[in-house]
From Swiss-Prot:
GO terms for cellular component: cytosol; eukaryotic translation initiation factor 2B complex. Component of the translation initiation factor 2B (eIF2B) complex which is a heterodecamer of two sets of five different subunits: alpha, beta, gamma, delta and epsilon. Subunits alpha, beta and delta comprise a regulatory subcomplex and subunits epsilon and gamma comprise a catalytic subcomplex. Within the complex, the hexameric regulatory complex resides at the center, with the two heterodimeric catalytic subcomplexes bound on opposite sides. It is found in: Cytoplasm, Cytosol. It comes from Bos taurus (Bovine). GO terms for molecular function: guanyl-nucleotide exchange factor activity; translation initiation factor activity. It holds the Pfam family IF-2B. InterPro entries: eIF2B_alpha/beta/delta, elF-2B_alpha_N, IF-2B-related, IF_2B-like_C, NagB/RpiA_transferase-like. This is Translation initiation factor eIF2B subunit alpha. Acts as a component of the translation initiation factor 2B (eIF2B) complex, which catalyzes the exchange of GDP for GTP on eukaryotic initiation factor 2 (eIF2) gamma subunit. Its guanine nucleotide exchange factor activity is repressed when bound to eIF2 complex phosphorylated on the alpha subunit, thereby limiting the amount of methionyl-initiator methionine tRNA available to the ribosome and consequently global translation is repressed. The keyword Cytoplasm applies. It comes from the Eukaryota. The lineage of its organism: Eukaryota, Metazoa, Chordata, Craniata, Vertebrata. The keyword Iron-sulfur does not apply. GO terms for biological process: cytoplasmic translational initiation; translational initiation.
Length: 305
């Protein structure tokens, strides 16, 4: 499976199921790559998979693709020392890969079960951008016969908030789309804030769509709970202390980074994500359980060991 086939397979996975997270599509692609690999050593297989992850990150530069790929590689590689026979070892690696994929496919439902209980009847919720996990949580709240209304930022520059508003309208949830600049104005009207995350970093902070940080700052200033919902495959080995510490490969789209290599100035581009400090986050709802920001590092160590 060469790089062109790898990229085409990845894109076809996303096209088949637009609701699928890009990280899940990447893991499915890596599993298919593992099945088709013709290498003869474990070391060579690991090197090929690492190269494949880098190729996928070049197509989709989101944090989740990077962390999901790395966790997948670690999870399937645990058996590599137990078997001396390569074919048997590869078979076990494929089986473990399928287990990993099944496990992460159930993540959103687990998170929804945990989080929707925090939504009280009559709640006014503020959210940001389009998050499939947040949508699943709100679907669970609707299924539990809870009445609530949602304010959502339009989320420039791609107006993904309007996509979220449309999805919520299908659930018959009252939705109001507000300007990104109106977050401070609307905050006094809401009871809680729920956002997704593109990545959860080692100190319990998050990397998410640009505008999340200002929402968290406003929520903290007005004593509103700020909840984050994210799957565990988004836990990434990164320890930013401020916005400048977030690597450019996560801040900008892959196409933008390629254009920079041809001489375009990155300072003229707008970042797509920002970093939100753990001190601004109330709780994180993950498929590993409900975590405080300080507990994230313990879980991250367990995942990556």
């Amino acid at each position: 499976m060469d790089n062109t086939e790898l990229i085409e397979y990845f894109k076809s996975q996303i096209k088949e199921d637009p609701d699928m997270a890009s990280a899940v599509a990447a893991i499915r692609t890596l599993l298919e790559y593992l099945r088709r690999d013709t290498g003869e050593t474990i070391q060579g297989l690991r090197a090929n998979l690492t190269s494949a992850i880098e190729t996928l990150c070049g197509v989709d530069s989101s944090v989740a693709v990077s962390s999901g790929g790395e966790l997948f590689l670690r999870f399937i590689s645990l058996t590599s020392l137990e078997y001396s026979d390569y074919s048997k070892c590869k078979k076990i690696m494929i089986e473990r890969g399928e287990i990993f994929l099944r496990r992460i496919s159930l993540s959103r439902n687990k998170i929804a079960d945990l989080c929707h209980t925090f939504i009280k009847d009559g709640a006014r919720i503020l959210t940001h951008a389009y998050s499939r996990v947040v949508l699943r949580v709100l679907e669970a709240a609707v299924a539990a016969k809870k009445r609530f209304s949602v304010y959502i930022t339009e989320s420039q520059p791609d107006l993904s908030g309007k996509k979220m508003a449309k999805a919520l309208c299908h659930l018959n949830v009252p939705v109001t789309v507000v300007l990104d600049a109106a977050v401070g104005y609307i905050m006094e009207k809401v009871d809680l804030v729920i956002v997704g995350a593109e990545g959860v970093v080692e100190n319990g902070g998050i990397i998410n769509k640009i505008g999340t940080n200002q929402m968290a700052v406003c929520a903290k200033a007005q004593n509103k709970p700020f909840y984050v919902v994210a799957e565990s495959f988004k836990f990434v080995r990164l320890f930013p202390l401020n916005q400048q510490d977030v690597p450019d490969k996560f801040k900008y789209k892959a196409d933008t980074l390629k254009s920079v290599q041809t001489g375009q100035d990155l300072r003229e581009e707008h970042p797509w994500v920002d970093y939100t400090s753990p001190s601004l986050i109330t709780l994180l709802f993950t498929d590993l359980g409900v975590l405080t920001p300080s507990a994230v590092s313990d879980e991250l160590i367990k995942l990556y060991l």
